[in-house]
């Protein structure tokens, strides 16, 4: 009897606070504000969410607030315009905020011949742009609804967060033939425990308090790249808030 072919391993990375410092949705919002997509008061709210996000990690309430504001600012905009802005945002804001240590981990998986996927609550287009720039396989993210090339301000299904990430991973593994038992997953948030628990090699990166406790008790690897860079990033954002108030 012929042996069934061995299923390959893959690697899956969260983006915000795992691969990139802070919220990529905030960075998109900042770029949109500079181009007068929305008023000053919305930018200030975005910035305060970012300070809290970097300092404390994600919460359901915070993610919902960021998502709602992001959807509101793209409502009525052309899809192509949004994609072009995302590419600009990567060059102007995100590229410099990629943690080189996390990016190196991703590249090590690429060098080992594994597919590397980003899985994020941010719009899928944001994840795809980052994956393309870093030479990774692809991305899964929250899907935005568009009609005749215009964004409606709604999402297709649920935000890719928490248990929804785990569902998406399971579906992707089935489609691509991955062995989850052999695979790797990286995240900073306890909200991603459903996803991390699905793979044989879960890793906590810049973990929030709850994930750090769980990872230690479970014997998972823990990487903390955040401590040395947290203070200057928070200072920079607070300066942006002051500029927004004066603007």
Predicted feature descriptions by range:
Residues 2-55:
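Active-site neighborhood of HAD-like aspartate-dependent phosphohydrolases
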Residues 2-8, 84, 91-117, 121-247:
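C-terminal cap/substrate-recognition subdomain and adjoining C-terminal extension
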Residues 23, 77, 164:
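Conserved active-site and cofactor/substrate-binding residues in soluble primary-metabolism enzymes
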Residues 25-28, 48, 66-67, 149-154:
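Acidic/polar active-site rim loop that often engages polyanionic ligands
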Residues 28, 66-69, 81, 126, ...:
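Hydrophobic alpha-helical segments typical of transmembrane helices
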Residues 51-65, 236:
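Cysteine/selenocysteine-centered motifs that mediate thiol-based redox chemistry or coordinate metal-sulfur cofactors
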Residues 64-101:
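Metal-dependent phosphoesterase signature
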